[in-house]
């Protein structure tokens, strides 16, 4: 139970985790400012806290609007009744079919019998669990020469004995082909070995791969035998063989399934079992592309910790939990509640539950989850913080039933530490918690995987995608709110409720759930694989499905990784410069997938010279030689499996896009758009799968052949365009390809107008496309005008797809889109480019740049513009790095606020002593502001701004571009006077005259004797300065009040991702110093 009589405990808001936090004061009102200095205009607000008459926040208005949409009788009725799922209609297993959308699946072994559990929801909203039985795991080995069918029974017995018994169920012979390498289209016998359960399949596999099985000398001892499809997860094997894909609909035919009345294991409304042979998987098309009425629950917790220490679930209590439950397809939540320790004033449109102690609250919330029975759990950082913390806290309090959060009786959820690592997403330490029957969609993980942002705090993400800031409350203030009154806890509850509501809004805005659903359907993997696994599993699933249809088996290749590399894509040397004529851009549509299709590149078509000679195949007739010397048979000999997969994906995408244009229902449109995007991503990932040297099935012959064809095509495109579009062929100018990169070329036709450039671009695309085999197609999509070409992979220009107006300013490789520099760089480069490209005012761009540099050197740039963020990706670095060293220093100051692996660390570069290494000069921005530590403006100019500025100005100004970094505008330099560190440790502060700065004795008046005759003038000047700073601070304060939704409460937000926050701290510091100076006049005798 929380001890509210003590002020020693402080509340830590989990939203700040895993983002850097530190102890510090909250910058609020300035006290002791006398009324003679216009204090009635300071606008700081009422300090008495919330009251019943206070204007409601904007979020409260939204809650009221939700409440108004509900029937009044429904509002007055018991909330518990609203939580329940719809009543189950009468179902006769002998006569009634059951259709449901399966959302979660797991493998389960009961005794020694394996089964699959499919959790789902029917079209009526009823929950269901289906036990699928009868499916056994298996793998293949190639039958050796001399192996006869009559040997099969003895082979099975001997193999089982070698595996120590109870492992092999039975074996059969099937005619298959090895997927890897062309062998003449002839099938050969393979032994299909079924094991009794998935956990011991590896035992049988190892017997073959280690050469431990000797059967009539056909499998020599000590010689390893390649196994096929022996490393496939049992659940995925079942889904592949039964054509089940993630999130699709399942049909249980009447009389084929049975209800499980005895020994029910779940709290689902329907529980049944069926043999896998009778289950019907429905393709995710037409009416079966719909979504069931899934229940989506978003939640957030607030927990209390000790001062300066991050909450420990074994000690620190959970004080509030907010939950919002929405049915998929509805815009209005049907459940909005907050579970609170201690009393809490009512919140409009929200059910508030008060509890005397924490154990009661946690136990009731766990029961609430089971009663409302959500299909999807969402939130922000719930996987790494909320769920594990709740479980550990309940364990500490010995609340036995709390971990029963899933749909299986007596299954206690436990959080486990995991490390996720992939080339695409990097390395992240995280936690996973099994909650059977419920999907977990952590919006923080979604953001980190799908978007490259400077910061992943909820506030930064909401600002980016929802266009609004979020109040971020410092944990020391949350302490006061919790230990205060029912009204103050109401404010905390609204804050908690909003943090539960925002992930739902983000999910809806970005269509994350529907996009991931379609990705699961397209690739065939379970939904939860999409966040927990990398890219390869998606291709593996598609490859195995198509291999099954063509009687191909996939070898289990042991890969230890290799340093072997292949040449990448071609980049045509750029003709750098500023182009004030239209530049047409020609792009190859789906270049790498189309190359694999056009040239039949696949595992199944890969040929070696010996096989070609043995089968008497003819070069250029039966097989082709790629530019890097690999052999692949032509389609009339064998159609490759990868080209078939790619053709199916791209054709399905065309169909989805065509259906999207005709569809009018917004939810169906969202599904179709998510589907076409998933199909595009899946097609593009096939090439990467073949080139992953540490992957499941690497084949550098395929990946290097693809890039070699790509290089050849780019060079050929350049040659064809420049030879055709010449003056001698009747055109007004000689065309020049000024740049080419991977799958596109930029062409200067020499014409002056957009319509002419677009016409020639369209014509050239069609002409070049005819030079290549189908389905390779060069498309004209856009014109850049004007165009700034800086270097390889660095350019900017106005993007035109129609002649009446430009679409956007587009840039690549320039600091406007990079996140490893401070925001000032992006702002300056973006503004300068807009002046040059949109306004075509190069002089204005120069003047703007000089003004920013001058402000930087005079310490006039806001701190928020100087913050650099870098990812902390591992614990050990070969070299000392600024963000790593700062993270360590922050850990020593306050271990609870230290960044964790995978977080982005925010820092600024400060002035250091001569000889200080760069990594020693990184510092926490808040610490810098609080202690007046001077920023190293020279570093920002020379290491952050200079190179990007020279890159964009040199193509226009040439050598004169360097004048931007030197001259009159750089001669005035000022910096803050530090209050800590360095020589200040030994300095003795001496008071000076406020008029002439002459030293005076401490405790004397504000002015020296020489300035006393100017006392009235100097006093008025100081009052004016205070008034000016009061107004500036009040404006920032008011802006923050508007953001928090209340003009009558103190601002308690400490969002490090908001520029207003840094401004408010800086102005507060200036105002406090100015007030202190003004107080010195009080000591004078007037």
Curated annotation (Swiss-Prot):
Keyword Transferase attached: yes
Textual note on the cofactor: Binds 1 [4Fe-4S] cluster.
Listed cofactors: [4Fe-4S] cluster
Zn-finger region bounds: CysA-type: 993-1011
Reaction equations catalysed: DNA(n) + a 2'-deoxyribonucleoside 5'-triphosphate = DNA(n+1) + diphosphate
GO molecular function: 3'-5'-DNA exonuclease activity; 4 iron, 4 sulfur cluster binding; DNA binding; DNA-directed DNA polymerase activity; nucleotide binding; zinc ion binding
Pfam assignment, any one: POL3_N
Binding of [4Fe-4S] cluster, residues: 1040, 1043, 1053, 1058
Biased composition (Basic and acidic residues): 29-58
Residues bound to Zn(2+): 993, 996, 1008, 1011
Residue span of motif CysB motif: 1040-1058
UniProt-annotated stretches for the region Disordered: 1-64
Main location: nucleus
Keyword Nucleotidyltransferase: yes
InterPro entries from the UniProt entry: DNA-dir_DNA_pol_B (IPR006172), DNA-dir_DNA_pol_B_CS (IPR017964), DNA-dir_DNA_pol_B_exonuc (IPR006133), DNA-dir_DNA_pol_B_multi_dom (IPR006134), DNA/RNA_pol_sf (IPR043502), DNA_pol_B_thumb (IPR042087), DNA_pol_palm_dom_sf (IPR023211), DNA_pol_type-B (IPR050240)
This protein's GO CC annotations: chromosome, telomeric repeat region; delta DNA polymerase complex; nucleus
Domain of life: Eukaryota
Gene3D superfamilies attached to this UniProt entry: DNA polymerase family B, C-terminal domain, DNA Polymerase, chain B, domain 1, Helix hairpin bin, Palm domain of DNA polymerase, Ribonuclease H-like superfamily/Ribonuclease H
Functional note: Catalytic component of DNA polymerase delta (DNA polymerase III) which participates in chromosomal DNA replication. Required during synthesis of the lagging DNA strands at the replication fork, binds at/or near replication origins and moves along DNA with the replication fork. Participates in leading strand synthesis during replication initiation and termination. Has 3'-5' proofreading exonuclease activity that corrects errors arising during DNA replication.
Subunit structure: Heterotetramer that consist of the pol3, cdc1, cdc27 and cdm1 subunits. The pol3 subunit contains the polymerase active site and most likely the active site for the 3'-5' exonuclease activity.
Miscellaneous comment text of the record: In eukaryotes there are five DNA polymerases: alpha, beta, gamma, delta, and epsilon which are responsible for different reactions of DNA synthesis.
Entry similarity comment: Belongs to the DNA polymerase type-B family.
Free-text domain note: The CysB motif binds 1 4Fe-4S cluster and is required for the formation of polymerase complexes.
Name of the molecule in the record: DNA polymerase delta catalytic subunit
Annotated gene: pol3
């Amino acid at each position: 139970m929380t001890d509210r009589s003590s002020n020693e405990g402080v509340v830590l808001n989990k939203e700040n985790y895993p983002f850097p936090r530190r102890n510090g004061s909250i910058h609020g009102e300035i006290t002791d400012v006398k009324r003679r200095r216009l204090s009635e205009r300071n606008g700081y607000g009422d300090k008495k806290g919330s009251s019943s008459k206070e204007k409601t926040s904007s979020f409260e208005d939204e809650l009221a609007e939700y409440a108004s949409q509900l029937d009044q009788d429904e509002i007055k009725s018991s909330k518990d009744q609203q939580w329940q799922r719809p009543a189950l209609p009468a179902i006769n297993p002998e006569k009634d079919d059951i259709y449901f959308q399966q959302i979660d699946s797991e493998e389960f072994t009961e005794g020694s019998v394996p089964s699959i559990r499919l959790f789902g929801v029917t079209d009526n909203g009823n929950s269901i669990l289906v036990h699928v039985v009868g499916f056994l795991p298996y793998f293949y080995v190639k039958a050796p020469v001399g192996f006869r069918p009559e040997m099969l029974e003895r082979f099975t017995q001997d193999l089982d004995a070698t595996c120590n018994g109870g492992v092999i169920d039975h074996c059969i012979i099937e005619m298959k082909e090895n997927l890897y390498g062309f062998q003449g289209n002839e099938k050969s016998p393979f032994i299909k070995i079924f094991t009794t359960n998935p956990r011991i399949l590896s035992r049988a596999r190892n017997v073959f791969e280690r050469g431990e099985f000797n059967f009539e000398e056909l499998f020599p001892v000590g010689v390893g035998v390649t196994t096929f499809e022996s490393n496939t997860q049992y659940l995925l094997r079942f889904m592949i063989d039964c054509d089940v894909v993630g999130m699709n609909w399942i049909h249980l035919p009447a009389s084929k399934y049975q209800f499980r009345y005895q020994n029910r294991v779940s709290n689902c409304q329907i529980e049944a079992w069926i043999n896998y042979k009778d289950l019907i998987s429905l393709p995710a098309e037409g009416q079966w592309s719909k979504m069931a009425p899934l229940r989506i629950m978003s939640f957030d917790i607030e927990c209390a910790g000790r001062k300066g220490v991050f909450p420990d679930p074994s000690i620190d209590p959970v004080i509030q939990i907010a939950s919002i439950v929405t049915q998929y397809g509805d815009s209005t939540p049907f459940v909005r509640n907050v579970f609170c320790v201690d009393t809490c004033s009512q919140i409009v449109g929200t059910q508030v539950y008060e509890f005397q102690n924490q154990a009661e609250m946690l136990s009731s919330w766990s029961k609430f989850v089971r009663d409302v029975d959500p299909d999807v759990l969402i939130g922000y950082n719930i996987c790494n913080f909320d769920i594990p913390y709740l479980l550990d806290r309940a364990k500490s309090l010995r609340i036995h039933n709390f971990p029963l959060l899933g749909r299986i009786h007596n299954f206690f959820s436990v959080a486990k530490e995991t490390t996720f690592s992939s080339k695409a997403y990097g390395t992240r330490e995280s936690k996973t918690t099994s909650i059977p029957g419920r999907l977990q969609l952590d919006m923080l993980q979604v953001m980190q995987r799908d978007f490259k942002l400077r910061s992943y705090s909820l506030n930064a993400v909401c600002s980016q995608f929802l266009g609004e800031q979020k109040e971020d409350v410092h944990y020391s203030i949350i302490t006061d709110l919790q230990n205060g009154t029912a009204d103050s806890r109401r404010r905390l509850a609204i804050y908690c409720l909003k943090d539960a509501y925002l992930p739902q809004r983000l999910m809806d805005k970005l269509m994350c759930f529907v996009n991931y659903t379609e990705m699961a359907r397209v690739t065939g993997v379970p939904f939860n694989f999409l966040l927990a696994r990398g890219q390869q599993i998606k291709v593996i699933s598609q490859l195995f499905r198509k291999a099954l249809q063509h009687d191909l088996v996939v070898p289990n290749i042991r890969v230890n990784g290799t340093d072997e590399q292949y040449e990448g894509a071609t980049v045509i040397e750029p003709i750098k410069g500023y182009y004030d004529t239209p530049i047409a851009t020609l792009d190859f549509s789906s270049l790498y997938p189309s190359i694999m299709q056009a040239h039949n590149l696949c595992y199944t078509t890969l040929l070696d010279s010996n096989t070609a000679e043995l089968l008497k195949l003819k070069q250029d007739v039966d097989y082709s030689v790629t530019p890097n010397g690999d052999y692949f048979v032509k389609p009339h000999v064998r159609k490759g499996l990868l080209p078939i997969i790619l053709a199916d994906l791209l054709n399905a995408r065309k169909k989805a896009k065509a259906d999207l244009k005709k569809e009018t229902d917004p939810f169906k449109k969202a599904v179709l758009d998510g589907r076409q995007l998933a199909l595009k991503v899946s097609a593009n990932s096939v090439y990467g799968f073949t080139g992953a040297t540490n992957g499941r099935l690497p084949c550098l012959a395929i990946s290097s052949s693809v890039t070699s064809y790509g290089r050849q095509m780019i060079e050929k495109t350049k040659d064809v365009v420049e030879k055709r579009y010449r003056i001698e062929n009747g055109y007004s100018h000689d065309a020049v390809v000024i740049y080419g990169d991977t799958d596109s070329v930029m062409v200067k036709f020499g014409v002056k107008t957009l319509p002419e450039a677009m016409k020639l671009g369209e014509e050239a695309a069609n002409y070049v496309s005819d030079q290549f085999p189908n389905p390779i197609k060069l498309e004209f999509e856009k014109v850049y005008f004007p165009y700034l070409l800086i270097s390889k992979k660095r350019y900017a220009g106005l993007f035109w797809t129609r002649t009446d107006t430009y679409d956007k300013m587009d840039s690549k490789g320039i600091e406007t889109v990079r996140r490893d520099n401070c925001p000032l760089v992006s702002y300056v480069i973006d503004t300068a480019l807009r002046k040059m490209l949109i306004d075509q005012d190069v002089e204005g761009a120069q003047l703007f740049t000089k003004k920013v540099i001058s402000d930087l050197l005079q310490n006039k740039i806001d701190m928020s513009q100087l913050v650099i963020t870098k990812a902390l990706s591992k614990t050990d670095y070969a070299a000392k790095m600024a963000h790593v060293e700062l993270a360590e220093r922050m850990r020593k100051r306050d271990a609870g606020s230290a960044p964790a692996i995978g977080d982005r660390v925010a820092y600024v570069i400060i002035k250091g002593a001569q000889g200080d290494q760069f990594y020693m000069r990184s510092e926490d921005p808040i610490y810098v502001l609080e202690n007046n530590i001077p920023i190293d403006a020279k570093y920002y100019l020379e290491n952050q701004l200079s190179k990007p500025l020279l890159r964009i100005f040199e193509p226009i100004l040439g050598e004169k571009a360097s004048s931007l970094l030197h001259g009159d505008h750089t001669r005035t330099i000022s910096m803050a006077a530090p209050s800590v560190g360095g020589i200040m440790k030994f300095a003795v502060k001496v008071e000076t005259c406020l008029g002439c700065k002459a030293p005076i004795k401490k405790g004397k008046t504000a002015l020296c004797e020489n300035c006393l005759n100017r006392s009235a003038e100097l006093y008025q000047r100081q009052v004016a300065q205070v008034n000016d700073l009061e107004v500036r601070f009040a404006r920032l304060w008011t802006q923050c009040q508007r953001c928090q939704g209340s003009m009558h409460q103190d601002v308690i937000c400490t969002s490090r991702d908001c520029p207003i926050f840094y401004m408010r701290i800086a102005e507060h510091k200036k105002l406090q110093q100015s007030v202190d100076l003004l107080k010195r006049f009080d000591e004078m005798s007037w």
